[in-house]
């Protein structure tokens, strides 16, 4: 019923833009021969992690409903600067919308919160710390926006706090998110 895949940093889950053939879905269909594969959820192209695929079309909606109804508890880890002045654990709630001034970026804005992330610091090594992130909502770039807004931009993030390369620039796999 399910196929669980460990997605690398650079690969989008579904075909998009210049990544039509080089997407996780297209690669899996070619490799497995299962044409009915469909992602149950997505993670950002720059993010590595587990992605669930439905094998049978008749099961897809039931699995997607688990994510939609927030019955799946997602956990992420991130490396970001250590700031002793920020007490952990904490909950970040904010309104996230598309940045009108930035290509494919999101920003926190005033208004009713539409995103929530629970954040804790796992350990510290010099100027860096490892954090665990529990998103309760699923806005685009939510974890990256929340960490950046706290003054804790994730190591290797190509968009936050500033765009490090344009949409047509070549990939730099030496410094992943």
Predicted regions and their residues:
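RNA pseudouridine synthases
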Residues: 1-177
């Amino acid at each position: 019923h399910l196929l669980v895949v460990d997605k690398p940093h650079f690969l989008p889950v579904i075909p998009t833009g210049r990544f039509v053939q080089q997407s996780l879905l297209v690669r899996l269909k070619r490799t497995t021969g299962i044409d009915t594969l469909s992602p149950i959820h997505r993670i950002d192209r720059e993010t590595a992690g587990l992605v669930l695929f439905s094998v049978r079309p008749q099961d897809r909606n039931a699995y997607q409903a688990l994510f939609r109804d927030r019955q799946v508890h997602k956990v992420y880890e991130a490396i970001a600067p250590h700031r002793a002045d920020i007490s952990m654990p904490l909950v970040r709630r904010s309104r996230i919308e598309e940045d009108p001034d930035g290509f494919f970026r999101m920003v926190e804005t005033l208004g009713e919160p539409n995103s929530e992330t629970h954040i804790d610091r796992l350990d510290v090594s010099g100027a860096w710390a490892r954090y665990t992130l529990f998103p309760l909502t699923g806005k685009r770039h939510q974890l990256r926006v929340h960490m950046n807004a706290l003054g804790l931009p994730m190591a290797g993030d190509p968009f936050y706090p500033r765009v490090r390369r344009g949409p047509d620039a070549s990939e730099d796999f030496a410094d992943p998110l």
